[in-house]
Amino acid sequence: MVNTAVTLCGLPLENPVIPASGTFGYGYEFAQIYDINCLGTFSFKGTTLTPRYGNPTPRIAEYAGGLLNSVGLQNPGVEAVIREELPRLREVFHKPVMANVSGFSVEEYAQVCRQLDSEEQVGWLEVNISCPNVHGGGAAFGADPRTAAAVTRAVRDVTKKPVIMKLSPAAADIAAVARACQEAGADGVSLINTLPGMRIDLKRRRPLLANGTGGMSGPGIFPLAVRMVYQVYEAVSIPIVGMGGVSTAEDVLELMLAGATAVGVGAANLVEPRACRKIIQDLPVAMERYGIQQLTDIIGGAHHG
């Protein structure tokens, strides 16, 4: 009998499969399709201090290797999430959940995390530092180790919950950013977020997305995710949530060998709503095929002699 259990920042997971933020809503839509309590946990929709209506449509475009999205962090704001979304979520998901947090200043990140700190069902805070710093010329907080560390410290000061910093693949040196986050008090890191990309409509001769650019996700970015998880594992000693183009149980094993403790599944949920359930069902079979008894034994296994 194989063992799929892992521990993420001190909290146990039945398995390492985590639907990624922005691809799973607040869970209750998917709960109408299958019992989402089979998941390790999930990261709910990115939450900001005030409501955001998101970018104009169209927001989604396809490419051969996956999807481009430019949703623009549409969400009702942290107060409405606490008042309306979390009570509904509790009815369908009976495990700790991961709260994804976004902000446009260091203070804003801290305010949102402070408000979520008292929510019992929130097990982890996943802090998305791919957002533009409106006080720093618009560059993403995660593009530079110093700004990434500043956000990490500010969040660490206002919460006792495990803090997982979600890193941008656009950083010049993602391992240096991860190291800075660890030194500033992060309990874990998650990577990779989407990559900036664009498609152009040949008939209109204009970008397919109303916003012009969007985040690339899907199988086309998986090898990049594996490389970056591998690099970050060698730079830090805190757990990694690996993600980026995951669509099979074998992908989960590959990212864990690269160094991930848990694995996020994003675009696959938009293509097939039951994707995570299938990956979880397939995981024991894949483990047996490759002679893996316990998942924790293979974390970072590709680095060993």
Give the residues covered by each predicted segment:
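N-terminal capping/small domains of soluble enzymes
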Residues: 1-97, 102-104
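Glycine/Thr-rich beta-alpha phosphate-binding loop at enzyme active sites
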Residues: 67-68, 131-146, 177-234, 238, ...
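Glycine-rich phosphate-binding active-site loops on the catalytic face of alpha/beta enzymes
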Residues: 44-49, 129-131, 188-198, 245-246, ...
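Short beta-strand/loop segments at the ligand-binding rim of alpha/beta enzyme cores
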Residues: 12-18, 93-99, 158-169, 233-243
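Catalytic cores of alpha/beta
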Residues: 28-33, 109-119, 171-184, 234-236, ...
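Conserved, mostly hydrophobic/aromatic
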Residues: 19, 42, 81, 99, ...
